[in-house]
């Protein structure tokens, strides 16, 4: 029996001190026990909540983002040779407008990727999806709600930054909504629209190459070590892990 347990028993079960002091001690012990239990439960809930947020972020963005003044074709060959890298997908990003049939529009970031990989690479919950003959795009639930859009609706994508110099009109292309996703954290549901590569090339006339590469690693990989390996093999690269990109969010959660 340790010293603290011995003192507690002497205090609680000493027959010479039956009365208010014993009752007060019992209430104090119960109070401390309940407080400790509540703290343990709160920490457990927060840890579980943090874990879910991490899964959502990694599922939407990947483990690592690679960018910078690099040769993307050569960089992708290098990534293929790194054992810890399970998968990657290059992308082009551009802020533009999405417009519904009533000419209501919303400014949003277009992410041009190999659209056939949107469901296999990104771990996103789709509340609706379907296949169509027209080029398909995928957008968030909030964006769809604000523009009153559903799967199968036709919309127009416009890129004001790539407007025709002669006519002064932005490039515009018609596509169809192939899926609506629901990420449920941050502003992801109203932040990005995934569009096909060929649509991106037609829309972003002033873009000359990729903007970055989303990278997926193994489940228990050491991201810091993988980041160092990539930096050593790819010159002039700018690399960020998911924790670095969202450092402020998780710092605030841990306060």
Listing of model-derived features with the role each one plays in the protein:
Residues 1-36:
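N-terminal Sec/SRP start-transfer signal
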Residues 6, 10-13, 51-62, 247, ...:
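Short amphipathic alpha-helical coupling elements at transmembrane boundaries
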Residues 11-15, 56, 60, 158, ...:
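Conserved, well-folded catalytic cores of nucleic-acid-processing
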Residues 22-29, 45, 56, 109, ...:
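Residue-level recognition of specific faces of alpha-helices
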Residues 37-109, 129-133, 231, 238:
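Hydrophobic, regular-secondary-structure patches
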Residues 63-65, 136, 212-214:
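Short aromatic/hydrophobic contact patches that present stacked aromatics
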Residues 81-208:
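A structural signal for hydrophobic secondary-structure junctions
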Residues 169-255:
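Mechanotransmission and gating elements of multispan inner-membrane complexes involved in transport
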């Amino acid at each position: 029996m340790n010293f603290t347990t011995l003192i507690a028993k002497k205090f609680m079960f000493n027959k010479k001190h039956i009365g208010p002091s014993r009752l007060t001690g019992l209430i104090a012990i119960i109070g401390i026990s309940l407080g400790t239990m509540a703290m343990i439960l709160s920490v457990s809930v927060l840890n579980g909540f943090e874990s879910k947020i991490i899964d959502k972020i990694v599922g939407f963005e990947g483990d690592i983002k690679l960018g910078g003044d690099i040769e993307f074709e050569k960089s992708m060959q290098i990534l293929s040779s790194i054992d810890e890298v399970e998968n990657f997908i290059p992308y082009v990003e551009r802020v533009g407008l999405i417009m519904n049939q009533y000419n209501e529009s919303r400014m949003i970031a277009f992410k041009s990727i190999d659209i056939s990989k949107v469901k296999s690479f990104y771990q996103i919950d789709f509340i609706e999806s379907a296949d169509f003959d027209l080029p398909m795009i995928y957008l968030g639930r909030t964006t769809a709600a604000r523009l009153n859009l559903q799967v199968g609706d036709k919309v127009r994508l416009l890129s004001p930054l790539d407007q025709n110099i002669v006519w002064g009109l932005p490039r515009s292309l018609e596509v169809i909504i192939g899926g609506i996703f629901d990420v449920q954290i941050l502003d992801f549901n109203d932040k990005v629209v995934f569009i096909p590569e060929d649509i991106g090339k037609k829309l972003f006339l002033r873009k000359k190459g990729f903007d970055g590469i989303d990278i997926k690693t193994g489940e228990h990989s050491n991201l810091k070590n993988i980041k160092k390996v990539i930096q050593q093999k790819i010159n002039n690269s700018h690399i960020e892990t998911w924790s670095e990109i969202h450092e402020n969010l998780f710092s605030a959660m841990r306060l």
